[in-house]
Amino acid sequence: MPVGGGAPVSVQSMTTTKTADSEATITQIYALAAAGADIVRCTCNEPAAAEGLARIVPRSPVPIIADIHFHHEMALAALEAGVHGLRLNPGNLRKEHEIKQVASEAKDRGVPIRIGVNAGSLHPDLYKRFGGATPEALVESARMELAYFEDVGFGDVKISVKASSVPLMIEAYRLASETFDHPLHLGVTEAGPPPGGLIKGTAGIATLLAEGIGDTIRYSLTADPVEEARAGRQLLEALGLRERKGLDLIACPSCGRAEIDVIAVAKAAQQALEERKLPIQVAVMGCVVNGPGEAREADLGIAAGRRRGHLFIKGTIVRVVPEDEMVDALVAEAERLVAEGIDARLAAADAGAAAEAEADRRDLLAGKGVDANASEERIELIRKKYGNHAEG
């Protein structure tokens, strides 16, 4: 997902699950992607979280950013896990040699880093020097971190200068846009619950975007992060910065429960749907156990089970079709959905579809087990190896 350089403004959000719980985290990532998130950030605060990232990254439908505080070793572990990017907080990760070590490793791996300055965790020296968390102090914090990166020849950088005060945030980003040539990640941090948090986030982010400042955004809400992703996407569409003209297809990368060749079905569905230029979100999921739930935010989806496909709209099963008709049925339903609307298609659902899906779900669990991907086995191994390395 390109950021800056003329690329469309992207939407970010952050998971609220424990990253070590990879199953819960990947479920939330799918929900965020379906709601409009282009990039998702996960905390990496302990070795178990890094182990979780190693399982999450290859299964994620969107790029994963590791959020790092205090411990540079966790940044290195996240890089080992294969993350697509890092966020470092210069307010609590302060040692020059550690920062340079992370930047050097990221450079070698071709992984970008966001310098994530936050008014609430500003370095005490800067707070004293500037008489508080001023726009100048926030920008200087980013500049100092950037200088460390430049010393090791690392330049694949994004910058954020967030604050919970909307006026402070706006002025800090205006100054940052005059100071840096790097992409800017916009956000009002700790904005609080909706509706107040939405109002504050929109006031800050929209003001800057309307001025041509900002390359990627995140609403920081005390709420289900799906609300963050949805708000971000809606804001960009309202400002004319993103327009859904065609298909937005998400698909699981398959797992031990998959009843179909997910890749083949996804490719066939994508080709057929793109030819029709339908402006909807469609999900192709490998099994009916978690598929409709993981992709419940998609307009339409299909999940496999017992040699047949289960069509769902916004997570609600509406029809069951033979396996060899899955793609055709998905395309036909997509055309009807665009023509008639979600409510009309939900009203036309087959009465027995949900019961058939539940029967298939139970059969799959009975046949392949609850832990088909051996996640519990992996978690137990992580506990044995890294249980004594808790964050301190």
Regions found by a protein language model. Name each.
Residues 1-42, 46-66, 70-183, 201-211, ...:
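Alpha/beta enzyme core
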